[in-house]
């Protein structure tokens, strides 16, 4: 009987959390992050990603500003290095606080994939880590035009629900707020 109780307790201790998100141990001191886009051809995908994070329910906002006022520069070209790398976020931190960052994206990335990549890289800018146990914004790779472990969009649509509720929960954990699910998971490519 005692052995059964120990086994049951051990099983309870290894059950994974319902929330699959991960953080990096860093975050912004302020809930407002000033962002500048230096790649005009990526304006639409960046707008989609910023709007998705700003609607996530976390008490953090990306605000668009001129480059001279930016804490984060988005749209730097990722043209060398790992051919499998579609995007990259770099942050400068001091004592666990993120001070600035740069988001890189590969030239020629199609706009719907670019929106996914920007949402993912802005997640890193917020302090989120990779999450591959479930469908998440922070999955470490794309499969075509959608994150790993996420359902492929039906024909004629794209995955416009750029921030999953699980990732919104991670941001709310860091910045406060109540995570909200995106209004739509898929949207028509015709607008």
Identify what each model region corresponds to.
Residues 4-15:
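Bacterial N-terminal signal peptides
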């Amino acid at each position: 009987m005692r052995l059964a109780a120990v086994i049951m307790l051990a099983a309870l201790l290894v059950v994974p959390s319902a929330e699959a998100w991960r953080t990096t141990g860093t975050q912004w001191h302020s809930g407002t992050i000033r962002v500048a886009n230096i790649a005009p051809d990526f304006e639409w995908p960046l707008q989609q990603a910023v709007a998705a994070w700003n609607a996530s329910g976390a008490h953090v906002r990306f605000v668009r500003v001129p480059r001279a006022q930016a804490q984060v520069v988005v749209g730097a070209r990722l043209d060398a290095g790992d051919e499998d790398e579609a995007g990259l976020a770099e942050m400068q931190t001091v004592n666990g606080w993120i001070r600035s960052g740069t988001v890189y994206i590969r030239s020629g990335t199609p706009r719907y994939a670019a929106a996914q990549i920007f949402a993912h890289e802005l997640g890193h800018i917020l302090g989120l880590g990779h999450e591959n146990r479930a469908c998440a914004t922070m999955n470490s790779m794309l499969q075509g035009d959608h994150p790993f472990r996420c359902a492929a969009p039906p024909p004629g649509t794209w995955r416009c629900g750029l921030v999953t509720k699980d990732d919104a929960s991670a941001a709310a954990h860091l910045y406060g707020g109540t995570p909200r699910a995106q209004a739509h998971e898929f949207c028509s490519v015709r607008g």
